[in-house]
Amino acid sequence: MRKPMMASVALAVSLVLSGCSTLEPRSTEVAPAIPSQWPAAVTAGAPATSTAEVADIGWRDFFVDPRLQAVITQSLENNRDLRVAVLNVERARAQYRIQRADRVPAVGVQGQMTRSGGDAPVTEQFSANLGVVEFELDLFGRVRNLSQAALQQYFAEAANRRSAQLSLVAEVANAWLTLGADSEQLRIAQATLATYEDSLRLTEARRELGGASALELSQTRTLVETARTDVARFAGQVAQDRNALVLLAGGPVDATLLPQAEVTEVASVRPLPAGMPGDVLLRRPDVMAAEHVLLSANANIGAARAAFFPSISLTGSIGSASSELSGLFDSGTRVWSFIPKLNLPIFQGGKLRANLGMATADRDIALAQYERAIQSGFREAADALALNESLDAQLSSQQALVAAAEQAQRLSQARYDAGLDSFLTLLDARRTAYTARQSLVSTQLAQQSNQVALYKVLGGGWHERG
């Protein structure tokens, strides 16, 4: 009885000793070369609204149009790229569970019957055992570091999924806005074409009566064909926009959810800079993913270092053995075994050192990628913040330009009808008003798209309210 008890105690002690040490290097301190404040051009005149709050704003709270919300919901359910990201998370979770299982003994039951014979009579032996097979004592943290690396890789994939979701939300919003803007451009072109065609008919009638020159007729036809070309171009663009939205949504989008000829104000929140860049950028899911990849690579160095040291694995079992199946569990049939095994690497042909070098290189690569992610994030955020104020000013000026151009067109038409202005002056006024209306739509789209970009680059929340 005492020997099996000693074997059990030895196994318990091994569990305590397992993982007592680790050779993982200390986490590398990262100080990316980014300014401690946003550029002065970005912060000038901005209200004190913290950008750090953007990460906590769910997309349903940011994009308030119910049609756009419905399309985003459809895309999150059906988009194939996001589905791949979700499956990568599941795969990483399973890999972590596999690696974590190596930190505890694998206990199994084994039953066996042996028949042997020769010149002597046939003999039979029956046995049933409960035991542990090849459990490694993690004295130098190899198993623990491998488990930690798998855990950090799982966290990285989870952050990648959030990044993919945020990117998808932004792409759907931009595609939806672009469809609305191009539909508005098509409507403007169609209305302008109808007006020009009316003018052409009047000019042709006046030409027959001798009241219009051949030059006026040709110039009017030029306007008509220009507008007709724009109608065809924007009609094709609208069709392409719908196809892009269908691809992002993962299937057909109900016509009632599509924007009509409009540029919708989708953003109810106008996040502006006040927080520190580091506070903002570290909440971006792509930066978080890069950080977890760095931590995973760091843990792999610990596992590679531990491979240089001896490893001890234990195999033990306790059970019964008998020559009669009916007496397998009778008294006096108990058996046990305890088999420690030592593995001491002596010569591996440079394999262990190469593995360590590869793990170190992977860590250095991950560090560079982490720093690059932060620097890229700072530039993207600074660019979007700088454009925010500029586009507001452009939109205000463009709206004033449209009002002035339309007023000039009305006055020019009246003066032409009264015989005070030339037909060329009227044509210039019409072209100016048409171009101004088109530019206004483009500026509105640019402003809204920048709001979407700002939400994305500041790590906008991926949660939705219930």
Language-model-detected regions and their locations in the chain:
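Residues within alpha-helical transmembrane segments of multi-pass membrane proteins, especially transporters
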Residues: 12-16, 103, 343, 371, ...
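Amphipathic alpha-helical coiled-coil segments
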Residues: 84-99, 164, 170-191, 195-198, ...
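Short coil/turn motifs that cap or connect alpha-helices
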Residues: 213, 252, 421-422, 461
